[in-house]
Amino acid sequence: MKILVDENMPYARDLFSRLGEVTAVPGRPIPVAQLADADALMVRSVTKVNESLLAGKPIKFVGTATAGTDHVDEAWLKQAGIGFSAAPGCNAIAVVEYVFSSLLMLAERDGFSLHERTVGIVGVGNVGRRLQARLEALGITTLLCDPPRADRGDEGDFRSLNELVQHADILTFHTPLFKDGPYKTLHLADEKLIRSLKPGAILINACRGAVVDNTALLTCLNEGQKLSVVLDVWEGEPELNVELLKKVDIGTPHIAGYTLEGKARGTTQVFEAYSKFIGHEQHVALDTLLPAPEFGRITLHGPLDQPTLKRLVHLVYDVRRDDAPLRKVAGIPGEFDKLRKNYLERREWSSLYVICDDASAASLLCKLGFNAVHHPAR
C-alpha cells in the first residue's frame, strides 16, 4: 500500500508508515507521476484536489490535515468512490490565539483596554465558539453572526451582519469560503461593509482570503478610512497584493493555524480516519508526539491584568515575528510558500506552565487555555 503525504505534515511519515509505504511529496504542485501507483493521498490546503488531479488514478482515499475543505472537490470524490476525511477543529485553538496575540499588540500600541471593546465574530464554528468563550472569560462583550447556524436553530444569540457592523469595535471573520448559494461568503466583507465599519474599528480575517474583498479594502485604506486591519489570508494566494500589505497593521502568510499542536491534530485526525477506512483502526495520543515545551515554568504574582496577559501571550507567540518576514519578501515569487514551508516551531498557550499565587488569576488562565496552577504565597 503506497501513501503519499505532504512533506510539511508533521509526524506524517512516522504515523502513516504503520499502515504502508510512505512517500513525502511537495504540496504545491503535487508531482502527478507519483499518483500513478498510490493508494492514498494526504494533503494540506495548498493542494487543489479535484477531477483534473485524480481522474484515472488509483487513489482510494484523500485526507486533508486542515479544518477547511474548499480546496477539495468533495462532490467529485464522492462520485468517483474515493474516501475522504478532513480535520475539523484541528487548528481552532491556534487561530484563536493568533487573534488574541494581534489584539493585545494593537491594544498596547493604541492604548486601549479590550474590556472597552465589543467584538463581532462572523462564523461561529470551531474557531468562533472558542474565541467567544475566551473573550467572555475576560469579560469582553461579543456579538455573534452565523446565518446557517441561526437558520438551523442552533443555540446562540445570533445577530445579523449589519448589527455587528453597526455595534462592533472589532470584526473578526471565521467562516468557510462559499462562492455562491444562500450562505455565500465570497466578498462577504465588500466595499459597502468596509465603509460602514465604526471609525477606528479593527478588521481581522484569519479564515479565507476572498471572504474580504482585498481590492475594496485597499481602496478604503488609500482613501484614508480610519481602520486597523489584520490579515493572515489573502486573495490569490500564494500571490498577494503588496500595496495592501503595506497598508495593513498586521500581515502574515496564512499561518494563523500553524501551531505544532494544531498541525499534529490535523495529521492524527486524518491518520485515524484512514486507518479506520482500511479496517486497521488506530488511535494516537497527541501528547506522545509533541516535544517538551521550550519554557519550563513561569511564576505569576498577583491578579491577571491586560499587560500581564499580553506578556504571557507574547512569551508563547508574538504575531510580529510573522509580520516582519512577510514584508521583507512580499512580491518575490515563491517566498510566500517558503515562509510557510520553513515556519518556525510555534506552540499553544497550554505549553506554558504558570504558577500563580492568586487563585483568581490561576482560574482565569485555565479558562484561557494556559496550564496554570494556584500555589499560595508563603
UniProtKB/Swiss-Prot annotation:
Compartment list: Cytoplasm
Keywords, alphabetical: Cytoplasm, NAD, Oxidoreductase, Pyridoxine biosynthesis
Swiss-Prot/TrEMBL catalytic activity: 4-phospho-D-erythronate + NAD(+) = (R)-3-hydroxy-2-oxo-4-phosphooxybutanoate + NADH + H(+)
Keyword presence, Zinc: no
InterPro entries: D-isomer_2_OHA_DH_cat_dom (IPR006139), D-isomer_DH_CS (IPR029753), D-isomer_DH_CS1 (IPR029752), D-isomer_DH_NAD-bd (IPR006140), Erythronate-4-P_DHase (IPR020921), Erythronate-4-P_DHase_dimer (IPR024531), NAD(P)-bd_dom_sf (IPR036291), PdxB_dimer_sf (IPR038251)
Family stated for the protein in its record: Belongs to the D-isomer specific 2-hydroxyacid dehydrogenase family. PdxB subfamily.
Family matches, as PANTHER family: FORMATE DEHYDROGENASE 1
Function as written in the Swiss-Prot or TrEMBL entry: Catalyzes the oxidation of erythronate-4-phosphate to 3-hydroxy-2-oxo-4-phosphonooxybutanoate.
Protein known as: Erythronate-4-phosphate dehydrogenase
Source organism phylogeny: Bacteria, Pseudomonadati, Pseudomonadota, Gammaproteobacteria, Enterobacterales
Gene responsible for this protein: pdxB
